Amino acid sequence: MKRRYFGTDGIRGQSNVFPMTPDLAMRVGIAAGTIFRRGNHRHRVVIGKDTRLSGYMLENAMVAGFTAAGLDAFILGPIPTPAVAMLTRSLRCDIGVMISASHNPYEDNGIKLFGPDGYKLSDDLEAEIEDLLEKDLNAQLAKSDDIGRAKRVDGVHDRYIEHAKRTLPRDVTLQGLRIAIDCANGAAYKVAPAVLWELGAEVVTIGNEPNGTNINLNCGSTSPVALQKKVDEVRADIGIALDGDADRVIIVDENGSIVDGDQLMAVIAESWAESQQLRGNGIVATVMSNLGLERFLDDRGMALARTRVGDRYVVEHMRQHNYNVGGEQSGHIVLSDYGTTGDGLVAALQILAAVKRTGRTVSEVCRRFEPVPQLLRNVRISGGKPLEDIQVQKAIADAEAELAKNGRLVIRPSGTEPLIRVMAEGDDRAQIERIVNELIGTISNVRTAA
């Protein structure tokens, strides 16, 4: 069933434009609060956010919704998404909320929901919430003497800082490392530099002056040029780029080269396999991860299990099949020994541990495999279902037959934007470029005709 509000990572859209309005945010609070208002205990919700201008508006709306449903609201302020997931569990809350649009520009915002176990909600639970949103919610309001209380909670940043520090192996210190970190003017602008400094590193920070409108603006994991310049300028050993809510990370090595999530997963998998920490004899990634990663793992007797795009689906597969490492090429790295969702800072600490233990440079540690040529392009759509068109389906089948075992083809609608994503990879770069361009042309022609 097609969902009206929830995409692959919660509800997301332009702020003050449906569905990302304060009215809907309040209704989500009432609906979600109703579903998680089970048992006779006093029910609680934690609400965090990143640094977007619209975050204050949506935070107030969600507090109103949850308290109207009878839940006490613990307001955390700007804090990373993985911290919200952690605090949902440690504060014994019934539900957790992160108000963020992750790596998107400040004009957008979103709502991510976590269950009492700290994991993102399942499709079924999101469907229940959507079903309630279509109904009259007045019947779900708490009685006057059961309305929830709201309060801002102090000290939660320190809890997350200590949690992150504990994920670095005890035999490792960051002393002697000069680290440049880009906090994307986002949720981790205070906690991430503090963690690195307290672990002994010399820290140079950029992207730590949020003003409500500069989150992810020419900074962070989706725009690492500023970090590359800073690494060169200060001669840093490593650069760490987080995104707006700090659930993803990209590394810059000492030469200024980008290290993506696939390479980071390879480093962690190999390191954890050597220390016998790795479970499942492999890792979980999505269909977008490079074929080179799959070959790298296979050569070392490890498996790569693939899921649909979205870190929540990676996590679901990890839980079902007892893996403890998973992630996405974009830098969502999930380490279930330490958390229930992607955590850019914790993932970076595992890379730093590998660097310190080996005594090698970041470029030597993080270049684990040669990626096969991969090309990803997007086609913007305004409606219709071009992937159901006969011409498009034939073009896809022809391309898959041509690639055969020498490459892969992934074509899918974006779960967060009105786009069709076309990705192909294989050993022959010219062939890949031709296939992608032909498919883009076919999809565009169908879209135009529609």
Curated annotation (Swiss-Prot):
Binding residues annotated for Mg(2+), in chain numbering: S102, D243, D245, D247
GO CC term, one of those recorded: cytosol
Pfam family name, one: PGM_PMM_III
SUPFAM superfamilies: Phosphoglucomutase, C-terminal domain (SSF55957), Phosphoglucomutase, first 3 domains (SSF53738)
Top-level taxon: Bacteria
One of the record's GO molecular function terms: phosphomannomutase activity
CDD domains recorded: GlmM
InterPro entries on file: A-D-PHexomutase_a/b/a-I, A-D-PHexomutase_a/b/a-I/II/III, A-D-PHexomutase_a/b/a-II, A-D-PHexomutase_a/b/a-III, A-D-PHexomutase_C, A-D-PHexomutase_C_sf, A-D-PHexomutase_CS, Alpha-D-phosphohexomutase_SF
PANTHER family registered for this protein in UniProt: PHOSPHOGLUCOMUTASE (ALPHA-D-GLUCOSE-1,6-BISPHOSPHATE-DEPENDENT), PHOSPHOHEXOSE MUTASE
Role summary: Catalyzes the conversion of glucosamine-6-phosphate to glucosamine-1-phosphate.
Name under which the protein is recorded: Phosphoglucosamine mutase
